[in-house]
Amino acid sequence: MRAALERDATARGDREICTVLGNRIAESASRGVAMLARAESAIAPTRDANDALSISPLRDWSVDDIWLMLTMFADEEKRPFPCAFSVRSIERLSDLYRAGNDGMCGVVLGESGQRTACGSRFGCVFCCVVGDRDKSLESMIREPEHAYMAGLNDFRNYLLATQWDLKRRELVGRSLSSAGYVRVQPDVLSFSERMNLLRYLLTLDALEIERAEQHDADLAAGLIPDTPENRDLCDVQFEMITPSQLVAIDFMLSMHHYAPHAFPAVSAWFEVHRLRRRYRIPKVDTFPKVPIVNHGWFRVGQFDADAPAEGLRDFGAEQWNRYRHPGRVSTYAQTTAGERVVYFEQSDHLDVDAERACEFVTCSFDYEWYARVQANAGIESARFWLNETILTLPTGKSQRYQEMAARGQYFARLAERLNLTPAEMDQYLISNAVKEVQQLDLFSMAA
């Protein structure tokens, strides 16, 4: 985003951009210390560690100052100067803070009444740093106008409860040592758990669409009062997984060695939004913190020790691209390390064409597609997104994604060769990991 803004600024003839921050010293002791250490200023831009300009106009404001400023704009006729946000936006903001404080927020908008600042704090709905419970969110969902967020709170609680369930973790290490080994140890979330989380979020999205449609019907039928709040609730209030995000998720999941078929994430979307399957978030007891066991090191060579892996190379696309995409300068591409892979294009960051993603996910991917992809290897959809340029890779990072694809394909083919299920493959990795590593170069095997 910053790179794009800088390009636009240069095109306009501007010297550089300055980021306006909403940080306040009074937010917390740690925030204040960090702001002072960075020498943030409210009156002049300062340079951060990356030599970028920023300014913090609210640096010395208190929470009372914030709400006093908002109350000044709560009356359309008495605003001191024009502003971009409406009175309704201020009212909704006040309602949110009141709901997050068990309905006892003392902010009164307008010219009359006691104005006591509300100190409730908000952030990411899935934040687990706040503790075992998100009390502000729990307070909000007790009120009818915010009850739609109950499922989001369930998802957050599920994340927190299962973070130490190591059976939900990946065993295959992400780094390849110079000796040709990967670590076998619980690490990031496993493929099956990532799919579970995706299905839960897709279900929440589908349920929110249904809620909004029913609310709209109830309002039209006169079953609920015609109020600004109820009119707002006729709209979908959130979408956790957009088509663009789904494509990016699918790209990553399809390179996983346990992906059972191509387009795993898009197939999950189809099951929820077209087949109307619902995946409810289970309530689980919190798993206690346990030691993370290193099972040892598993030999893979250059991901060629016991099975072949070509990663993102697509022989079929190389043959067909001259016919399907005759305007391209080549039918394939090369990574930064010179490896031949499927055709791809690059941008400042991993990016997805939002319009084409939406078209493919919501229109092209039908029952025929859903059935056909069950017979295709997972890696094929990663190649598809690249070859069709629906997804572009970060400039200069192509080799990194090739290595990810090769690792996933290697273990997928090893499991196929040994005829092992994912659970059996995990046990095979543990049983065949090198426990005694004295004969290996420990320095080269550092994680």
Annotated model-derived regions:
Residues M1-A447:
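Nucleotide-activated chemistry modules centered on ATP-dependent adenylation/adenylyltransferase
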